[in-house]
Amino acid sequence: MVTVDLHELNLKPNDVVLDAGCGLGRHLRQLARVPGLKIFGIDKSTGALRETSKSMETMPDAQSKDYLVSIADINKLPFADASFDCVICSEVLEHIPDHKKALKEMDRILKPQGTLVVSVPRYFAERICWFISRDYYNEEGGHIRIYKKKQLREMLTGQGFQCWKINYKHALHSPYWWLKCLVGLKNEENFLVKYYKKFLEWDIMKKPRPVRMLEEFLNPIMGKSIVYYLRKG
C-alpha cells in the first residue's frame, strides 16, 4: 500500500531521498524502482528495519541499489544540513509528541527547493475511529492526535514550506478500520474483518481496474489519509 505518488516528485538520478519513519519499507521499495537514487530509511523499530532490509535485498526489480536503512530518532536526525533532495514522512507525525521538532529536523536536512511529502490520517476518518473505540487512541505507540486539514497545512507553511498539492488516499481502508474499532482492534477472527482484509490484500496485489477506479472516486470523500506535497523555501 503506497501513499505517496512518486510521479509527483520529479526524482532524478543521484537524488538523495529519505523515508523518515520507513516502517516495513513500503515507500522504500517504490523508491528502489526509480533508477539512480540514493535512498535512506530510518525508523525506531529494529524489527521493522530488519524486515525492510530483507525485502530490499531480495527485490527482483530494483533499479536503485544504493540504499541504507538504520535506527534513528526523527527528532534528532543523524544527517548534515541540506543533504537531501526529498524527504518522505508518511503516517508518522500523529505518533510523535514533539511533532514540531520533527518538522524542524526535516527542514534542516532538506536542500533549498527540496521536496517534503507528509501524510497523516484524515480528520473525518480518524475521528470516527476515536469515537467508536477508546482502545484505538489508548494503544501504546498509537495515534496521539488528530490533524485538521487547515491546522496541519498552517503548521507546515509556518515552518517555511510551500504547499503545492494536497490529495487523499486509501478510501477503501477507512471502513476496514471502522469495523475493527467496532468489533475490537485485536479481533482478527470476526467474519467481516477477516474477509474485508482479504479483499484489501487482493486489491493491493492485483490492482483490478474497477476497484482502483472506485477508490479514486471515493478518496476525496472518505480517504483514510491526507497527503501534503511541499517545497522548501
Regions found by a protein language model. Name each.
Residues 150-167:
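A SAM-dependent methyltransferase catalytic signature shared across enzymes that methylate proteins
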Residues 1-80, 86-90, 100-103, 190-227:
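Conserved N-terminal segment of class I S-adenosyl-L-methionine
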Residues 119-120, 169:
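Alpha/beta-hydrolase-fold catalytic nucleophile elbow
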Residues 90-93, 119:
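Residues lining the SAM
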Residues 121-145, 154-155:
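Short, glycine-/aromatic-enriched active-site segment of Class I SAM-dependent methyltransferases
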Residues 100-115:
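A short glycine-rich, Lys/Arg-flanked "PGG" loop and its adjoining helix->strand segment in the class I
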Residues 165-201, 224-225:
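Conserved catalytic loop of SAM-dependent methyltransferase domains
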